[in-house]
Regions:
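Conserved beta-strand/loop scaffold segments within soluble protein domains that form the structured core
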Residues: 79-373, 387-415
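N-terminal amphipathic, basic helical "cap/leader" segment at the start of enzyme domains
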Residues: 1-119, 123-124, 293-296
């Protein structure tokens, strides 16, 4: 049924970037396993897979500051482990396939409820082809002091990765989940089309952090949506640096009174890249609050677009939204676009949207170069200053990595 829906539903060409039409679904491999199993011990992971994740620093980070790790290699989870004390508290952290099989009574009621199969063409594709991803359940009142983390690696040519992540925070529970995404570059197109569903029950808090650094041959077409019940909070902290085309709009449906939603977004588009990112906030209950802060950087002929939706449903009162959208153009050929959609159908609500576009000041760069910095160093300093207030929202380990990646992009752009 899901595959039939995928074939019947049209591509979102009425608003999506033109580059999406170049994707040939017939040339994508929809499942590729390497004989791996979700090992619980790092020593048991096959050597070739282990070497890949060791270069990414997975075992060191797990020992240093993580409560649990899930590492996916192409279509399947290669490694999954969680600290023993969390298991004793009833926390579940497994791959989604195992979650469906072993914890069906928790998994099944919410699977596909936040993002149904008929939501759009790519949700149907994910329903038909999904494998891997994370399933997390945090019991009532349990608050995790350390983050859980997942790594997604596409290591093969012409691959399609269709992980499915479902995170449920029971009443009063709190957690942070972080994911990193990487892939080597190939000449042929690769597709990443994951689905993420978050459920924050009464008074729960979920923070979902992403640093995406796919290779530029990757189409990054993902759907991420959270459901926040009464007094719950969902925060998406999102950074997109890689992929040739990204379409990504984290959303929060504010379903319960006094629910809160936030999206913090950083996008960087180099020549040959289009970062079409943004956020959606649906105020479906009174006295709900949302905040969107998005910053984009366009380098060379890179293009970054902000696409956002804020919708206060009919009859909702006392809702508040703040949206800030800032773009920085590095070169005269760089491009940015903003497509806000705001709909307020209730009374006594406040919605505000601010947007700005600026260019790097040549006089400022000249001044810094006179103080001994190279042009690349001066440019990195200017860019890091532009996004500094958002980078501070990322966990320490990710913020350091993020600054390093941006420095590398600046060096490559100047040569």
């Amino acid at each position: 049924d899901a595959l039939r829906r995928f074939h019947e539903m049209p591509m979102p060409t009425h608003w999506a970037p033109e580059g999406i039409n170049d994707l040939d679904f017939d040339k994508i491999r929809y499942y590729l396993a390497h004989g791996t199993a979700p090992y619980k011990s790092w020593e048991d992971v096959p050597d070739d897979v282990k070497r890949t994740f060791e270069r990414l620093g997975v075992p060191e980070q797990e020992r240093a500051f993580l409560a649990g790790v899930d590492a996916q290699y192409d279509s399947e989870t290669a490694y999954n482990n969680m600290r023993e004390e969390l298991s004793k508290q009833g926390v579940i952290f497994v791959n989604s396939t195992e979650g469906l099989r072993e914890y069906e009574h928790i998994f099944r009621p919410w699977f596909g409820k936040v993002i149904p199969v008929n939501d759009n063409k790519f949700s149907a594709l994910n329903h038909a082809a999904f494998s891997g991803g994370s399933f997390i359940y945090v019991p009532k009142g349990v608050k995790l002091s350390q983050p859980l983390q997942a790594y997604f690696r596409i290591n093969s040519e012409s691959m399609g990765q269709f992980e499915r992540t479902l995170i449920i925070a029971d009443e009063g529970a709190e957690l942070m989940y972080m994911e990193g995404c990487t892939a080597p570059k190939y000449d042929s197109a690769t597709l990443h089309s994951g689905v993420v569903e978050l459920v924050a029950l009464k008074g729960a808090k979920i923070q979902y952090v992403t640093v995406q650094n796919w290779a530029t041959n990757v189409y990054n077409l993902v759907i991420q949506r959270g459901l926040a019940m009464e007094d719950a909070e969902i925060r998406w902290i999102d950074c997109n640096i890689g992929s040739g085309l990204t379409m990504k709009y984290p959303a929060v449906v504010l379903q319960g009174r006094r629910a809160r939603g936030e999206v913090i977004s950083i996008s960087l588009a180099h020549s040959g890249q289009l970062q079409d990112t943004g956020a959606r906030m649906i105020h479906a209950a009174p006295e709900t609050t949302s905040n969107i802060v998005a910053k984009s950087i366009s380098i060379g002929e890179g293009r970054a677009s902000y696409r956002g939706e804020v919708n206060v449903l009919k009859g909702m009162k006392g809702c508040k939204n703040n949206t800030e959208c800032d773009a920085l153009l590095i070169n005269a050929t760089s491009r940015t676009d903003t497509y806000p959609a705001i709909s307020v159908n209730g009374n006594a609500s406040a919605v505000q949207h601010e947007a700005s576009v600026s260019q790097v000041d040549e006089e400022m760069l000249f001044y810094m170069q006179q103080r001994g910095l190279t042009r690349a160093q001066a440019m990195s300093l200017a860019v890091n200053g532009f996004i500094n207030d958002l980078v501070k929202e990322f966990p320490m380990e990710y913020s350091v990595e993020l600054r390093r990646l941006i420095d590398l992009e600046m060096e490559d752009s100047i040569g």
